[in-house]
Amino acid sequence: MFDRSLASFLLPAQILMAKLLAISSFWKAAGMTRFSTLFQKPKPVIAMVHLGALPGSPLYDAAAGLEGLLSAARADLMALQAAGIDAVMFGNENDRPYEFQVDPASTATAAYVIGQLRAEITVPFGVNMLWDPRASVALGAATGAAFIREIFTGTYASDMGFWAPDAGDAMRYRDRLGRSDMLMLFNISAEFAHSLDQRSLPDRARSAVFSSIPDAVLVSGQITGEAAALSDLEAVKAILPDTPVLANTGVKHETVADVLRVADGCIVGSSLKRDGD
């Protein structure tokens, strides 16, 4: 016999689950659509423009000053665009030691450099201020970036200490700044760090997509320039067939074909530079 009391409990739960699954499917499809709409081609290659060490960093070259930073960034940008790269991303990889809260002077200087180059950028561009989601959002909003990259989810033990970024805060901050159109690329395997989450990388990726609605998921190696394991890319892509999955580190000319056989794109930095610098 039909148990009305049980049904009154189960049916709302089933409806709620159906709604949650529908929302998840919507955001997966939206993420792939936003990603493909931005890049306009399959499997984009995004090249890094590594800014020189910025003011506030111990490695900043005060003698060369802002003009030195601008000149170096312009040279990299022009070379990459002339070579036919699909997109570029400006980042502060040289601001070592890294911080979880970037010096405002560094973010302001990055905005100045990108602003000076803005009219010369002919491809989609993104930004990343390591390892500060809010600074990355602010820089992206100020410069008109099409996308940002950061660690937005998870809990880590790292060279910089314990680390627990807040995706909800970063995404709401982006929207408050009027840039809900700016894509958020989630690095789910942080360099220089070890996840304290006992779940597998694919499970963490799937959870991040459901809970934090990224536009793409990035898989990294242990440090800058070290390749993500192809098996990790395969496992994450298998569990996220409807979400863009990119290789974030260590892609080289001799491996890019194998990487793009699995991944939906890649980010390339060191391997495009003379002596990796």
Where is each model-derived feature located?
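N-terminal small/glycine-rich loop or linker at the start of catalytic domains
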Residues: 37-64, 177-192
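Hydrophobic faces of well-ordered beta-strands that scaffold small-molecule active sites
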Residues: 45-49, 90, 125-127, 149-150, ...
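Glycine-rich anion/phosphate-binding loops
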Residues: 63-75, 129-132
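Catalytic cores of alpha/beta
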Residues: 132-143, 251-265
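Conserved anion-binding
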Residues: 141-214
